[in-house]
Swiss-Prot record:
The PEHE domain, residue ranges: 815-966
Entry's localization field: Nucleus; Chromosome, Centromere, Kinetochore; Mitochondrion; Cytoplasm, Cytoskeleton, Spindle pole
Organism whose genome encodes this protein: Mus musculus (Mouse)
PANTHER family per the UniProt record, alphabetical: KAT8 REGULATORY NSL COMPLEX SUBUNIT 1, NON-SPECIFIC LETHAL 1, ISOFORM M
Interaction with KAT8 HAT domain, as annotated region: 841-859
UniProt record, GO biological process: chromatin organization; positive regulation of DNA-templated transcription; regulation of mitochondrial transcription
Biased composition regions of type Low complexity, renumbered to the chain: 245-256, 759-772, 906-919
Keyword Cytoplasm part of the UniProt annotation: yes
Coiled-coil segments on the chain, per record: 285-312
Protein name, entry field: KAT8 regulatory NSL complex subunit 1
Sites of N6-acetyllysine modification: 104
Record's keyword terms, sorted: Acetylation, Centromere, Chromatin regulator, Chromosome, Coiled coil, Cytoplasm, Cytoskeleton, Isopeptide bond, Kinetochore, Microtubule, Mitochondrion, Nucleus, Phosphoprotein, Ubl conjugation
Amino acid sequence: MAAMAPALTDAAAEAHHIRFKLAPPSSTLSPGSAENNGNANILISANGTKRKAIAAEDPSLDFRNNPTKEDLGKLQPLVASYLCSDVTSVPAKESLKLQGVFSKQTVLKSHPLLSQSYELRAELLGRQPVLEFSLENLRTMNTSGQTALPQAPVNGLAKKLTKSSTHSDHDNSSSLNGGKRSLTSSSLQGGEVGGPDSGNLKGGMTNCTLPHRSLDIQHTTLYSNNSTANKSSVNSMDQPALQGSSRLSPSTDSSSNLTNVKLEVKKSPLSSILFSALDSDTRITALLRRQADIEIRARRLQKRLQVVQAKQVERHLQHQLGGFLETTLSKLPNLESLRSRSQLMLTRKAEAALRKAASESATSEGLSNFLKSDSISEELERFTASGIANLRCSEQAFDSDVTDSSSGGESDIEEEELTRADPEQCHVPLKRRSEWRWAADRAAIVSRWNWLQAHVSDLEYRIRQQTDIYKQIRANKGLIVLGEAPFPDHTTDLLSLSSEVKTDHGRDKLIESVSQPSENHGILVSNITESLSTKSCGAPRPVNGVVNSLQPVLADQVPGDSSDAEEQLHKKQRLNLVSSSDGTCVAARTRPVLTCKKRRLVRPSSIVPLSKKVHRNVRSGCDVNPSCALCGSGSVNTMPPEIHYEAPLLERLSQLDSCVHPVLAFPDDVPTSLHFQSMLKSQWQNKPFDKIKPTKKFSLKHRATMPCSLSDPVRKDRHKLVNSFLTTAMLKHHTDMSSPSYLTATHHPPHSPLVRQLSTSSDTSTPTSSGSQVAASTSQPVRRRRGESSFDINNIVIPMSVAATTRVEKLQYKEILTPSWREVDVQSLKGSPDEENEEIEDLSDAAFAALHAKCEEMERARWLWTTSVPPQRRGSRSYRSSDGRTTPQLGSANPSTPQPASPDVSSSHSLSEFSHGQSPRSPISPELHSAPLTPVARDSLRHLASEDTRCSTPELGLDEQSVQPWERRTFPLAYSPQAECEEQLDAQDTAARCTRRTSGSKTGREAEVAPTSPPVVPLKSRHLAATVTAQRPAHR
C-alpha cells in the first residue's frame, strides 16, 4: 500500500473518481433511507466539486454558506471498498470487498481523546466500534497548536489533497460519515475539521464507524513521501478523519485552511444541540444488521471447521485400524500381482490366503486370544476411548437431533436407571458386543456380494467366449454347392407318350397333366425363395434352394488369400446361376455336388475345458446339460456325492439340501430340520442296542400273529398290515445291524412265497379252492425249510411304494387261533426240588477230552501206520488199479485169503491237501495179513469205515489189542516225529523182506493176490502231515 501512495499523489487530475466506504448514516437521515442504503457513496471529481448519491437533506440542518440544490439520483449499491480509476469510473458491482476489524485497544491507546473518555471506551469495548465526538472535542483538536501536516492515510492509502484551480465557493471539501456532516479538507490538515465551508458543519454528534481493519497496517502506511517529516505530531488528531472520505490539500495551503476552520467554529456553535439530533433507532438497526452478518459468517466458518475436524478424525481412525490389522495379519501374501486378472481369481486367492493364515498357529492363536480375552492392553483401550469420543463429538456437530437423552423419556425413570446401574462393570469381550455382531454381519454381506459380483462377471465373460467360439465355428463352415439339375427322365417319357396320342383333345390333356406338376413346383420354389429373401437380412442369395442369411456376414469374416478370393468369386457366379429357378427345379439330393468343404465335427463332450481349474460335479438337483463344455461334467452323476467331512459346514449342508448354497447362504438360512436330522441320525447310529434273543417258543407264537391280524375287514387289515410291516421293518433294521445273522440273511431271496402271494394277490383274483391249495403248498416247504430258523414276519421288508399301491386281500387259509396274554405265576415256573437235584451235564474241557480220547487214539494209530509202510515198486504185475482203489484179485486156489478193505477215497482228502506228492493208499499192514477175518468182522469194518470218514483204518476185529490212551500233551511237541518215523521204518523194512521171501516161493496166481504197498511219502511231506494232524482239534 505504501508503494502505491506516490502514484496516487502525483497529479491531481489523474484521480477522476474515488469511491470510499462510509460509515452508517447519522440521525439526520430517515429510517427508511437508512435501511435501504446504509452506506452512501461520495464521488469527488477532479475539479473539486462534490456529487452526493443520497437523498436530499433538510435545509434547516444544512450549515453551508452557499447551499445548492442537488438532483436526486438512484440509490447506489452497497460498496464494501473503494476503487481508484485513472480514466473512467468503475461500476459498483465490480468493487472489491475489503473487510477488516479494528483493534479496540489500539484505537483507544493511540488517540489521547478517546483514551481519556471512560464512557466511550466502555461503549467501544462492549458494542460495535462507533466513535462519537462533539464540537468541543473538534475545537480542542483544532487549537492544539500543531502545524498543518499532511493527513493520515484513509483505508490504508495516503491521498494527496487536490487543489482547486478556481478557488471558488465550492472549494475542496469532503463529507464525513456518509456526507451528512461535511468537513473541509483544509481543516483536517491541521488536525481540525473545517474549511471554506465551515458553516456547513452540522451541530451535534458526529458518527464515525471505524472499518474492520487493523490499525497496525494503517500505521505502516501513514503518509506519503511528501509528509514523512511531521507524521508523529498529528497522529493523535488524524483518527476522526480515517473513516470519512476527504480530500487532502497540499502542505502549502495549511495555514489558510487552519484560519478558515477557526472562523467557522466561532460562527456556528453546535454544543446546544449535541444529543438532540441522534437517531437511536437507526443506529440500533444498523448495529443489529451488522451483528447478524457476523453471526452468519461465524456459523459458516464453524461448519467448515467441523468438516475439517471430521475428516481428520476419519483419517486418523483409518490409519490406526489399518495399522492394527496389518500388524495382526502381517502374514498374508501380497495380492497386488493378481489385480490385473479376473475378480474371481482375486477372490479365490484372497480366500485361500485368509484360510491359510487362519490355520497357522501363531496368527490364529494371537487373533483368537485377543478377541476372546477378557482384558485388553491399555493402549488399545485408550485409543478406543479417544476414537469413540472424537466420533461422538463429530456426530453431534453434524447431527443436531443427537441428544444425550431420549425425548420421550422421563427424568425420574432415567435417574433410577442410572442409580441402579453398576459403575464398576466388568469388561465385556469384543465378540459379545453388539458392535462386533453388526460388523460381522456387515462383513458377511459384503464378502458374499463381492463373491457374487466376481462370479457374475466371470459368467458373462464365459458367455461371450462361448458366443465367439460359436461364431467362429459357423464362420469356418464351408458351403456345399450343387450343380444344375438335369431334365427329369420321367417327364421325357411322359412327353413321348403324349405324342403318340391320336386325338388333339387327348394330347392337350396329357400335356397339361404332365407339365402342370413341374410348373407348379417351379412356381412354389420361386415363391418360397422370394419369401425367404424378403425375411432375411440384407440381400442374401439362395443356396441349394434355401436362403442362408449368414452368408454375406460370414464371407467378410473368413480371412483368406488369393485362392480364397477366387473361390468366393466362383461361388458368387454359381449362386447367381442357381438362383434363377425355373420349372425344372428338383430336390437337392438329385443334383450333383460341385464343391464340399470338409466340416469339422465338434462334439461338446470331447472339448477340453476352457479353464484349467478342476471341475466339480454339480451339487444341485436341477437339470443340467450333461454335454456343456463350460460345466466340465461329462455326465451327470446320478449317485449321491460323497460327503467330504473336511469341507466347511455350509458345503456339506448344500449336499443334503439343494436350497442351501455353499457360499451365499447365511447360517440363518439353514433349516432347523437339517440340524435336528443330524442330531437324530447320530443318536440312532451311535447308541448301542442290547439285542434280546427270544426263545424258540416265543418266536413260534409271534409267527402265528400275522394270520390273526387278517381276521378283521379288508380296509382295517390293509392299514394294520402296512403299518406293522413298516414299523417292524424299521425296528428290525436297527436291532439286527450288529448281529451276525444280518450278514447271512442278506444272501437269502428277498421275497418269501408268502410275500409273493401278497404282491400277486392284487393282480390276479383266484378262487377259494385254488387259494387254499396255494397256501397249503407254500406252507409245507416253509415248515421243512425252517428247521433251525423259524419264520419271522420281522424279516419281511416291503418298500413304501409297494405297500401304498398294493391292495391287501384276506388270505384263503384256515385261521389259527392264538391265545391272548395271560397272567403267569412266576413261582410256578421255578423247578421242583427234585429237578434241582438232577445231575447237570459237565461241559468242562476235561470232560470233552475224555470223551474224545478214543477217536484221538484211532487217529494216531492211522497216521503212524501210514508212515510205517515200506516203499514198493510201482507197475508190479501182482497189483493193478481199478476204480481208483488198489484191490488184490481173489484167487480161486485159496478162497480163504484175506481181502483187505481199501480205504475210502474221501478219507484221503485230508492227507492230499497237505502232502506235496501223490496221496498214498492205505491197505492193511503186512503183519496182519495172516489174521483171518470172518464176514461179521468184515461187515463191522466196512460199517466203521463208512460211518467215520476221518478214520479209514478198520478195526482189528477179534484180535484187537487194547491201546493205552495218550497222555496230555503240550504243544509244540517235545519229541521229533521225524526221528520216530525213521525208527519205525527200520523195523517195518525187516518184516517186509521176510514177507517177500515167503511170497516168492508161491505160484504166480497166488503172488498176484498179494497186496502192493503204496509208495512211501517223502520224509518232508510226512513231517508236514504229522504236524498238521497234531494241530487239528481233538473233537469234531
